[in-house]
């Protein structure tokens, strides 16, 4: 193998080793910050040598990107799970939106430190920013397809769904991160749902 040639693991043990590096590296970066974490620390946390890390990853940025791919799936796709397995119509959309908001809030709580670190990096790292933009659009299209399959109006649906996603995302950020004491979150949830129902 050439120096600095990146391996793609095939055997189960090697795959597990790579996954351990991703998990350990991602958790460390989210805990300490990207610029306060080095590859040697990631190797120690994963229980491997630094050389092993460099067999699978060019640098800690590659580890972070792989971690973000897993984190993004955990954050985005629970919202889709709420909608994908049941019949949706105007009569039960209120109920579905409440479940979606609850799922989104819980995922933000579970990944609060990770979310804060990653969101800060979307402003300075083009690759990470592009990854999140692509995921947002993919989620918009997936939810739009689910609504279309259930008979909802197709007119401006991508735009409507994208606005709805951001309303829910902003609401979750308020509940999990900002926590303004003068705001009633039950009222805010009702207002978000009411507005989404009005334009979907």
Language model: regions and residue ranges:
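A conserved beta-strand->loop->alpha-helix hinge within the catalytic CA
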Residues: 41, 91-96
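Amphipathic alpha-helical packing segments from all-alpha helical-bundle domains
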Residues: 73-81, 95, 102, 106-110, ...
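Short hydrophobic clusters on alpha-helical segments that form packing/core surfaces
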Residues: 21-29, 104, 168
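Helix-turn-helix
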Residues: 16, 20, 28-62, 66
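Hydrophobic/aromatic-rich alpha-helical bundle segments in the mid-to-C-terminal region
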Residues: 116, 148-195
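Alpha-helical bundle regulatory/interaction domains
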Residues: 2-6, 50, 61, 67-71, ...
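Amphipathic alpha-helical segments used for helix-helix packing
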Residues: 83-84, 105-127, 173-178
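N-terminal intrinsically disordered/low-complexity leader segments
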Residues: 1-16
